[in-house]
Amino acid sequence: YDGPRLADTIPRFHDMGMRYEQLEEALSKDVKNRAAGIKDELDFLFANKERGMVLVEGLKSKKLKEGITHNDTKINNILFDEKTSSPLCVIDLDTVMPGTVLFDTGDLIRTATNTAEEDEKDTSKVQFNFPLFKALIEGYYSEAKGFLSDYEKSLLAESGRNITQIMAVRMITDYLNGDVYYHIDYPEHNIVRARTQIALIKSMDEQWDKVQAFIDGLGK
């Protein structure tokens, strides 16, 4: 993209540092007295805080190129032809703004490779679907290899883990704040969502060696 820089429609949308600041503020206030019941989830997220900074720090250091990203790349934001099922266009463009391409690959991986619903109460059903991940990345890389840098390529899998983590942070923050951002259908909905994201990260981590080996072998 060689045109003028787009405006940030939602400033620092995928800024992991800011999201942790929001979590820490929500935790300090604990307006609904919920923190004591989610110690394990909080411990996990804070233990992974430093790793979660890789994309935002990459942008700041310019190791990652800034481009134009959609920032909400889930399959239900693609409009399909009713008769042929062929994709027609991308929709829901209110979050289009500057970012790293890895924001988009990350959200695509997060939403496409989970074997369960985003709000599955039984986290044993939440698994990272490695065969689907492979097919997804092979298809993506066949089109993206011309513009992805080696560093961006090396972080393709990490991007999925990263965006899953930021969603868990945001969901737990909203839970602590009294469910003021995300629509909920029952009082525990946000913490159920967050637990699903954390379970997906743990499933990714269990398979990480083969995941990263696959990424390292792309295009070779």
Please tell me what each predicted stretch does.
Residues 62, 76-117:
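Catalytic activation segment of kinase domains across protein kinase-like and atypical kinase folds
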Residues 1-7, 144-151:
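Surface-exposed helix-capping loop/turn segments at secondary-structure junctions
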Residues 2-70, 75-89, 162, 180-185, ...:
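ATP-dependent phospho-/nucleotidyl transfer catalytic cores
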Residues 102-146, 162-181:
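Active-site activation/catalytic loop segments of kinase-like enzymes and analogous catalytic loops
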Residues 45, 136, 155-156:
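A structural signal for short hydrophobic/aromatic patches embedded in well-ordered alpha helices
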Residues 196-220:
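Structural signal for terminal/edge beta-strands and the immediately following C-terminal loop/tail
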Residues 29, 51-58, 93, 111-114, ...:
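Conserved helix-loop functional segments at active or binding sites
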Residues 148-160:
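All-alpha amphipathic helical-bundle segments outside canonical DNA-binding/catalytic cores
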